[in-house]
Design a protein with these regions (language model features):
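Active-site loop/turn elements of alpha/beta-hydrolase fold enzymes
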Residues: 27, 63-65, 159
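Von Willebrand factor
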Residues: 51-70
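Active-site-adjacent betaalpha module
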Residues: 1-21, 49-54, 80-197
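Active-site loop signature of alpha/beta-hydrolase-fold enzymes
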Residues: 30, 66-68, 162-163
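Acidic/polar short surface loop at catalytic or gating sites that assists cofactor/ion binding
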Residues: 67-84
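Short hydrophobic beta-strand that contains or immediately precedes a catalytic carboxylate
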Residues: 23-25
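Short acidic, Gly/Ser-rich segments with clustered Asp/Glu that frequently serve as metal-coordination loops
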Residues: 28-35
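…and closely analogous acidic/polar surface helices at protein-protein or active-site interfaces
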Residues: 35-52
């Protein structure tokens, strides 16, 4: 965390639990990819490969709407044409889900709103949510904030997230998330944790 804080306090870290779940947020073929670092996708792939070796559950979220957009909520962004059943809402090939993974279709920034994600996490007895994907200032922030609010230890590996709006909102939101509930860690720290499971 030295790249966010001059003097990081270990007391500000909540740490990992014992039953993690990886959430890959909105790494879809369609939608706005402007400025999303390729490293976020590559590093998410590394993370999920290691998670599978340890049988850690992996979930994916995708934004997808009806073709008439009647389920598209009020939004400041123009419609991204993310229509259910089209190629644009499929997860990117580099990080595609396996048969053992689960996929959540959502309508808002947070996958906890209007979905069965909370039920799935409860059934898996999860206590730690590791959040990866796009966009740090939108869906990543909303996902991490809600995960923390529901009582989960929330981890954001910095190298596994990116923001289409640029590096400033990316870093500002990571800093704020770390202060307000999530642990923003390095990919190496998360991989070391998985290795001990």
């Amino acid at each position: 965390m030295t790249h966010y804080f001059d003097k990081p306090q270990k007391s500000t870290y909540l740490g990992f639990g014992e039953r993690p779940v990886i959430l890959v947020v909105d790494l879809m073929k369609g939608g706005s990819m402007n400025g999303l670092p390729g490293r976020a996708v590559r590093n998410t792939r590394i993370l999920i490969q290691e998670a599978r070796k340890k049988n850690v559950p992996i979930g994916y979220t995708v934004l997808a709407y009806r073709s008439d957009l009647k389920d598209y909520p009020p939004n400041k962004l123009a419609s991204m044409k993310l229509v259910m059943g089209t190629e644009s809402v499929k997860v990117m090939d580099e990080v595609a889900p396996g048969p053992e993974d689960f996929v959540i279709i959502k309508k808002t920034n947070s996958p906890f709103i209007g979905t069965n994600l909370l039920l799935l996490l409860t059934l898996m007895q999860a206590d730690t949510i590791i959040v990866t994907g796009r966009h740090t200032s939108g869906c990543i922030r909303a996902t991490a904030a809600d995960a923390f609010s529901y009582g989960y230890r929330t981890i954001v590996p910095e190298e596994c997230v990116g923001d289409g709006k640029g590096i400033l909102p990316h870093k500002a939101n990571l800093c704020d998330l770390h202060i307000r509930g999530a642990d923003v860690l390095t990919l190496r720290e998360v991989l070391e944790y998985l290795g001990k499971l």
